[in-house]
Each structure stands twice: as C-alpha cells, then as structure tokens.
Amino acid sequence: MRRAPAFLSADEVQDHLRSSSLLIPPLEAALANFSKGPDGGVMQPVRTVVPVAKHRGFLGVMPAYSAAEDALTTKLVTFYEGHSNNAVPSHQASVLLFDPSNGSLLAVMDGNVITAKRTAAVSAIATKFLKPPGSDVLCILGAGVQAYSHYEIFTEQFSFKEVRMWNRTRENAEKFASSVQGDVRVCSSVQEAVTGADVIITVTMATEPILFGEWVKPGAHINAVGASRPDWRELDDELMKQAVLYVDSREAALKESGDVLLSGADIFAELGEVVSGAKPAYCEKTTVFKSLGMAVEDLVAAKLVYDSWSSGK
C-alpha cells in the first residue's frame, strides 16, 4: 500500500532549516550546475505565471529536476497585491517533493520559510563573490520577511561594522531594528540609507525605481531581490547600465525582470558562472545581482528539509 505523503508545516520546515547558512554549499553547487546547461543535469523551465486579474494576484508554478541531488520538486506560489494582513499574507507558497524514480508524491511542505531562506542564501553567495574588499556598511531597503532572512544570514556570514535600514513605513523599519539582534540604524530616506554603503539589499514591493545610481558608492554591490515582474522596478536606468550585471538565470531575467527589460541593461553573467569560475567576479566595480529566484533553489532546500525530517523519524 502506497504511503500517504508527509505534510511539513512552516514550524517543521523551520526546525529542519534553522540556519540559512546550511544552504550555501549545496546552493553554490546547484547554481554552477544550472549555468552549465544540459551538462549540469538541472532541468528547469522559466516559471509559469497565471494572472488572476480580477483579484490583483497571480499563481506561479516552478518545477525542477536535479540529477546531482536526484530530486524532483515543484513550488506553487501566489502573490496578491495589496492583500497583506495577519490572516492572509500577500505571498504564499507550498513545495511538493516527488520520488524521481516513480513520480509518487513524498511530501508537501510550507514554502514560505524555504523561499525566504534560500533567497537570502543566494544573495549571500553573490555578495561573497562580488562585494568590494573591506566592506563595512550594509544597507537593507525594505522591512518584510526577506529583510529578516537577509539580515540573519548576512550577519552570520559577514562582519559589517554598520547596518542601515529604510522602509517606506518607518514604523516597520523601527520594529525591524528593535526585533533583530545587533544594532540597526533606521534612516529617513533611501538616499540617507545608501550613501556610502558597500553592500545594498533591495527587498521592497516597489514597482518604480527607488534606488538611483547617483546615490550609490562606486564599487558597491547591490542585491536586487524585489520587482519580480516585467513591469516592476527597484533600480533606475543609470544604476542598471553603469553596473556589471549578474543574474541567477539569463532566460528568466529576459522574461521576468523589469529592472533588466525596462533599462535595456546588458547581462554580463549568471551567478553560477561566477561560482564555477567560468566568468569573473568584478568586485572592484559597481555590481548588481538581480535575483528572481529559481526552482532549483527550492529543490535544494526542500531536499535538505526532507532528508533531515526523514532521518529523525
């Protein structure tokens, strides 16, 4: 008799993925394999997006198979603009893990924790390769879930002397600063927050540019994580064109990233090409890593969670 699939709640996923840093080695390998094309053994189409215009939302479907992990997953993610509240968040996600040998469903797990932690871990990988030498000042724009997950791993992996925070709603920025470990300076404007910063993380809901090239220190590194639709932006044309542009997936960036499409900026490399050594990391120049998120990243995290859960049964 076939066993029923396991269901792992957000709390259970969190228990088996306490530190985003655990994801860094397998994610580096997965990024490198993805950027090798078919030879890397990663099968991953660009996400399918189903608009729900009547309710200002969309459903995204993100499947992947990785030969290295011998894992098969798909993530279902919904986003509903302007519907964020305590009862129903704007972003919701579930990850389905299958047995790749026969297609049976092994587990359904909450995808929100996975999304937050794998996204932050990939930003940390990009920063490891692209941040300028002697980086002292970290700036985070946005105070949502991704701000917390990025702060957690960035303070684990790097030694910044100052962390700055800006959010459109100052109350949420102050809540962030008071709830995390360590000192965070809340800034009144984006310009104040980013001036002189070595590493900038944009995790906002902006649909128009909020970060302008004239404010950015030459040689700074920017992780652009928000603006996941082709008509949304966080960065202006000047910044996108003056920086060396890295992406997680060329194909996805040229279909989904408003920052890339609307600026006409040229993509220099995928992050996986930097990890593998196929392309250089220009850490002495201003760099942008445009992160859209990839299904293989969810796969790596889901496999790690499931293996940990299975071993503890």
UniProtKB/Swiss-Prot annotation:
3,3',5-triiodo-L-thyronine binds at residues 47, 256. NADPH binds at residues 90-91, 118, 143, 145-146, 167-169, 172, 204-205, 225, 291. InterPro entries: NAD(P)-bd_dom_sf, ODC_Mu_crystall, ODC_N. One of its GO terms (cellular component) is nucleus. Signal peptide: none annotated. Its EC number is 1.5.1.25, 1.5.1.1. Keywords: Cytoplasm, NAD, NADP, Oxidoreductase. It is found in: Cytoplasm. One of its GO terms (biological process) is sensory perception of sound. It is an enzyme of class 1 (oxidoreductase). One of its GO terms (molecular function) is thiomorpholine-carboxylate dehydrogenase activity. Pfam families: OCD_Mu_crystall. It catalyses: L-pipecolate + NADP(+) = Delta(1)-piperideine-2-carboxylate + NADPH + H(+); L-pipecolate + NAD(+) = Delta(1)-piperideine-2-carboxylate + NADH + H(+); L-proline + NADP(+) = 1-pyrroline-2-carboxylate + NADPH + H(+); L-proline + NAD(+) = 1-pyrroline-2-carboxylate + NADH + H(+). It comes from the Eukaryota. Catalyzes the NAD(P)H-dependent reduction of imine double bonds of a number of cyclic ketimine substrates, including sulfur-containing cyclic ketimines. Under physiological conditions, it efficiently catalyzes delta(1)-piperideine-2-carboxylate (P2C) and delta(1)-pyrroline-2-carboxylate (Pyr2C) reduction, suggesting a central role in lysine and glutamate metabolism. Additional substrates are delta(2)-thiazoline-2-carboxylate (T2C), 3,4-dehydrothiomorpholine-3-carboxylate (AECK), and (R)-lanthionine ketimine (LK) that is reduced at very low rate compared to other substrates. Homodimer. Binds the thyroid hormone triiodothyronine (T3); T3 binding inhibits enzymatic activity. Belongs to the ornithine cyclodeaminase/mu-crystallin family. This is Ketimine reductase mu-crystallin. The gene is Crym.
